[in-house]
Amino acid sequence: MVDGNYSVASNVMVPMRDGVRLAVDLYRPDADGPVPVLLVRNPYDKFDVFAWSTQSTNWLEFVRDGYAVVIQDTRGLFASEGEFVPHVDDEADAEDTLSWILEQAWCDGNVGMFGVSYLGVTQWQAAVSGVGGLKAIAPSMASADLYRAPWYGPGGALSVEALLGWSALIGTGLITSRSDARPEDAADFVQLAAILNDVAGAASVTPLAEQPLLGRLIPWVIDQVVDHPDNDESWQSISLFERLGGLATPALITAGWYDGFVGESLRTFVAVKDNADARLVVGPWSHSNLTGRNADRKFGIAATYPIQEATTMHKAFFDRHLRGETDALAGVPKVRLFVMGIDEWRDETDWPLPDTAYTPFYLGGSGAANTSTGGGTLSTSISGTESADTYLYDPADPVPSLGGTLLFHNGDNGPADQRPIHDRDDVLCYSTEVLTDPVEVTGTVSARLFVSSSAVDTDFTAKLVDVFPDGRAIALCDGIVRMRYRETLVNPTLIEAGEIYEVAIDMLATSNVFLPGHRIMVQVSSSNFPKYDRNSNTGGVIAREQLEEMCTAVNRIHRGPEHPSHIVLPIIKR
């Protein structure tokens, strides 16, 4: 029996296999016997529980309802011992922590996990460790392939904004974790705060690999991430994705259309859904905003994911899999999506949607597509004549990131108006005619472009945009391909200047109804900064080059019957 009261034990030290002790706080209900347990592994300070938990659940309700909650500082941070090296020790530490919990008299042998972002990644690491008592996980906005998200991406470009912003945040935690203050701590803290306040400025420093503060505080940032642009063995050794195929651990996966992890959240759902009770919730959210309210686009009160709703969903999921309450998820859909445009939630039976019609929309035009007032067109018919749109990509003047799946760029993520970049000559715009009927796009989006460049390496970007009758051009999803990685992320190969290549761009996913009076637009360019690092166009080691060593590229998008550049939209007709 549980009466709603609970006790707290702080800084209980849990031994790992190498003798390092990790600190946990125990929130235990006043119960007559052992209870199910929920574990959170947190690199952001377990004492600051309500700051990060507002993005997930009101977990104290779990405790009041009879669950014990264990919150742990990950290795090397705050009250835990050891050295913090991102991701490297987390699987073993999760396994050891779970084993310790299962040995405690107050645990009934059933453990679950929940949490957002890094806290979600630690759940996948725990799940693949194979500890039998882990009965369910609820990773929100997380990844099982850390190369593809958050540090690089499916196109091979460095997610420099995410890397520098997150590293600066972790750096502040490392400083405050120290038991003995150092003379340089105050100045270091101020510099880290400056990075967080101006990530674009920090990303503009060249060579990018010369980040003395981050390199000193978190050598992993340079040694593992920046200096390993290929998806090599060092990345594959910490990737979990290939191990998910046989995973039977039930998973409640939460994602956001404007979150940098959305592609990997959806990919992990597909990977585990056949062997486990996998549930998926996707809203119009970014990594730091679950309200559905943004400066350029408001989705209404229905888009807000209130803590209570998330808590209720999580509790039902854990009741089913930790307590064996078979009816706890009765009436709960396998997939729940927020469909933008009509701004409504919709229940689905699967992802991808079974009735998806993947439809090519071809780039065309009566003239040059440069700027939004150019002659670029978008239609389901291939243009009858061959043509090419040309622009200059200058790394010293990259196209600025406007909204989208940014993580730390001063909160400017989410559905942003793209009009501020429409007058740039290096932004090609291809638009449909004004729509007379609604067009629903729900699913993964990709582009197949025929491109050439004067450089031996460069980038190409593609962005899907909803153009409103009032002129707003709201971005929905986007992607990038680094030409050296056009064939494989493992073995880069440069291109021949002037030769035409067909490339695929993974633009992640969205769910949006383009309403009558709107237009569908595709924007193509060669940079999206600081979301991604700038390609130097030299074919060299980009992170080790000075800005003065970089060069301007003449880039072309070829279109027509011989080179049918197009975007593939997942059309839903109902």
UniProtKB/Swiss-Prot annotation:
It catalyses: cocaine + H2O = ecgonine methyl ester + benzoate + H(+). Optimum pH is 9.0. Induction: Positively induced by cocaine. Disulfide bonds: none annotated. Substrate binds at residues 44, 118. GO terms for cellular component: cytoplasm. Its main location: cytoplasm. Its EC number is 3.1.1.84. Residues 355-574 are annotated as: 3. Gene3D superfamilies: alpha-amino acid ester hydrolase ( Helical cap domain), alpha/beta hydrolase, Galactose-binding domain-like. Changing residue 407 to A: Decrease in activity. It is an enzyme of class 3 (hydrolase). Residues 241-354 are annotated as: 1B. Residues 1-144 are annotated as: 1A. Because of the high catalytic proficiency of CocE, it is an attractive candidate for novel protein-based therapies for cocaine overdose, as this cocaine-degrading enzyme could be used for rapid cocaine detoxification in an emergency setting. However, wild-type CocE is relatively unstable, but this can be improved by specific mutations. Thus, improved stability of engineered CocE enzymes will have a profound influence on the use of this protein to combat cocaine-induced toxicity and addiction in humans. Also has a potential as a highly-sensitive drug detector. It holds the Pfam family PepX_C. InterPro entries: AB_hydrolase_fold, CocE/Ser_esterase, Galactose-bd-like_sf, Xaa-Pro-like_dom, Xaa-Pro_dipept_C, Xaa-Pro_dipeptidyl-ppase/CocE. GO terms for biological process: cocaine catabolic process. Homodimer. The protein aggregates upon heat inactivation. This is Cocaine esterase. It comes from Rhodococcus sp. (strain MB1 Bresler).
